[in-house]
Amino acid sequence: MYDYLVVGAGLYGAVFAREAKKRGKSILVIDKRHHIAGNVYTEKKEGIHIHKYGAHIFHTNNKEVWDYVNQFAQFNHYINSPVANYKGELYPLPFNMYTFQKMWGVTLPEEAKEILDKQREGAGVKEPCNLEEQAIFLVGKDIYEKLIQGYTEKQWGRACKDLPAFIIKRIPVRFTYDNNYFDARYQGIPVGGYTQMVEKMLEGIEVKLGVDYLANKEIWDKQAKKVVYTGQIDAYFHYCFGTLEYREVSFETEVLDIPDFQRNAVVNYTDRDTLWTRIIEHKWFQFGKDDKGNDLDKTVISREYSTNWQKGNEPYYPINDEKNNTLYEKYKALSQKEDKVIFGGRLGEYQYYDMDKVIERALKKVEEEEIIENQRRTSGL
């Protein structure tokens, strides 16, 4: 019997498995997919590491987490600087002086602030109650209508008036000339891709792929003293309170026999009429070079589409509105009665976590498990 059965070979599962093994525990990792690394999985085409489930740029202010991931991969110095395309007009992101200069022709922060203040006053928003009001409060009506509204409504499948304000609070606004999207001390992408990094995390650990845990739960539960579950928490409990809502993302990926398509890794299409939310050109995550530093003659692009999640498909983003969060709390209360199961990760905790937060939580959980075990040993249980 194993000490832990880890369900899911994504970042949470891989980090937990690695750290538990270091503490002398026996581990079995299983995953329903036929590959490791979860949604950060990368695969190689034409010398290019393809982000199969969408763009993943690692960023963190946590030095402990940064040092941790650097044990398993060398990170390049990629800086996330996406571009917004509104009906052929290109705007730098995040919202900064370059954006304001293109939008209004201003060059000084005071000029941009004056325009924003007028647009806020005109909208009459003092305490934003939804995403639309929050966006106008942050960046004014012009930027909201051109660069936020259409993109966000495609991404979430709802009118901005019907989305919670907190979603837009993640978007940075700067009055400096700075196209670095993430205000993080550490940033980059693993040289050789994320899959290679997760492979190193799982070295020496037994892994079985193509295994559906929930389809044979009783059998798998007998294999270990404790289960670490990183799948959908509502599915674990057979949707007994109802189904939590997610957004689903699909991709159309093409290999193009040209050296350059858009000259940028990520371009967001912010008008409502363009069906895709963004186009990723993967070669620019590695600066247009292969692993040996050679120029790449071809390129690979992925058009990204957001839709409502359907059961049986891969869920991507939890929809953390009031209705779904209330439903999640019911499942969370049930999960706390499962003494031999740990629920973790985006799906297990129904939270939109960045990669560094997933790793942080997995490291913390292993430490908590060690403390519990030491307490039991001390008390003679």
Where in the sequence are the language-model features?
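N-terminal Rossmann-like FAD-binding beta1-loop-alpha1 element of flavoenzymes
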Residues: Y2-V29, V366
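Active-site/ligand-binding neighborhood in enzyme catalytic cores
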Residues: K87-P92, M97-K225, T230, F237
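Glycine-rich FAD pyrophosphate-binding loop
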Residues: K21-E46
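C-terminal catalytic lobe of FAD-dependent flavoproteins
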Residues: E314-L381
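Dinucleotide-binding Rossmann-like beta1-alpha1 core, especially the glycine-rich loop
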Residues: E46-E121
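Short, well-ordered alpha-helix to beta-strand connector turns
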Residues: Y2, G24, I205, Q223-K225, ...
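Mid-domain catalytic core of redox enzymes
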Residues: R23, L214-L334
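Short, solvent-exposed loop/turn segments at secondary-structure junctions
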Residues: L11-Y12, H34-H35, Y98, E153, ...
